[in-house]
């Protein structure tokens, strides 16, 4: 599913929304950088941004905006999100997911599917949710994840209201609970997993997560990063061969001039931006988990 654009050339000059399937262990900014560099490889400069950060250990739908469409990213932020989650019972972790070691092991063999479904049903509706310590939320001018790295814990973290529209437990396999959730903007699925474990009295953490939808946009309509790169380069190649591809030609000429003037300084700035954003992403900046 792609946004409409006004260009009649191969490369949409007004920009577009790209629906991508984020791979495991990639940060959201890894994806943005890859697409941005693809345009650059084709000789075009394009703004590229994304809506709704996914943690490195999550996969699924990541919506990118290019060109003028980056100004419309805010229109996507408030959309509900759907996830498929795997929750492991019988242990907790400091980050509420697989990023930190298991602690507080508790036997969970007595927990039945009916018990989990009953507990999950109680979560449906509006509720207050505290951000996890391993998150980019602020406390007295400092990121929570920065405090967590120092071994500090803020007990009274500012909670915000979220809505869990649906919490469907599909099946269990040993200590693993498989479920589908539809939640409002800003919901941390890993916090829901931790709270479910507490409600069952055995502890739990998020063992796997895949985002399947953002509002009306679905992962079934998404492309892989490599397919998106191939499509962009193909569009640029077609545009180069068209008499009407004047805009792209001017962009390429301007791009080469700017690159020549900027030289290594631009390269260094880009590398620094990638490094900084990777650190932020891996610390769950604006994470929806």
Curated annotation (Swiss-Prot):
Residues 265-289 have a biased composition (Basic and acidic residues). Gene3D superfamilies: Pseudouridine synthase. It catalyses: uridine(55) in tRNA = pseudouridine(55) in tRNA. GO terms for biological process: mRNA pseudouridine synthesis; tRNA pseudouridine synthesis. It comes from the Bacteria. InterPro entries: PsdUridine_synth_cat_dom_sf, PsdUridine_synth_N, tRNA_psdUridine_synth_TruB, TruB_C. It holds the Pfam family TruB_C_2. NCBIfam families: TruB. This is tRNA pseudouridine synthase B.
């Amino acid at each position: 599913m792609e946004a409409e654009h006004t260009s009649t050339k191969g490369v949409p000059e007004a920009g577009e929304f790209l629906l991508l399937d984020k791979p495991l262990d990639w940060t959201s900014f890894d994806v943005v950088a890859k697409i941005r560099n693809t345009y650059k490889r084709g000789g075009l400069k394009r703004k590229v941004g994304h809506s709704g950060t996914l943690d490195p250990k999550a996969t699924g739908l990541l919506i990118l905006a290019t060109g003028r469409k980056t100004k419309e990213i805010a229109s996507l932020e408030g959309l509900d999100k759907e996830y498929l989650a795997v929750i492991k019972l019988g242990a907790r972790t400091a980050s509420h997911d697989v990023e930190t070691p298991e602690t507080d092991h508790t036997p969970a063999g007595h927990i039945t599917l009916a018990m989990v479904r009953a507990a999950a049903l109680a979560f449906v509706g509006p509720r207050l949710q505290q951000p996890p310590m391993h998150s980019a939320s602020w406390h007295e001018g400092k990121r929570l994840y920065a405090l967590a790295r120092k071994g500090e814990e803020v007990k009274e973290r500012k909670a915000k209201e979220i809505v869990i529209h649906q919490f469907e437990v599909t099946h269990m396999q040993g200590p693993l609970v498989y479920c589908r959730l539809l939640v409002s903007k800003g919901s941390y699925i890993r916090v829901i997993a931790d709270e479910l474990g507490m409600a069952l009295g055995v502890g739990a953490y998020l063992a796997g997560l895949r985002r399947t939808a953002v509002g009306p946009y679905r992962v079934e309509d998404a492309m892989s990063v490599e397919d998106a790169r191939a499509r962009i380069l193909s569009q640029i190649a077609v545009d180069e061969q068209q008499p009407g591809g004047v805009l792209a030609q001017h962009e390429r000429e301007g791009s080469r001039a700017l690159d020549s003037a900027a030289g290594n300084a631009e390269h260094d700035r880009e590398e620094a931006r990638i490094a900084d954003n990777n650190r932020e992403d891996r610390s769950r900046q604006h994470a929806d988990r």
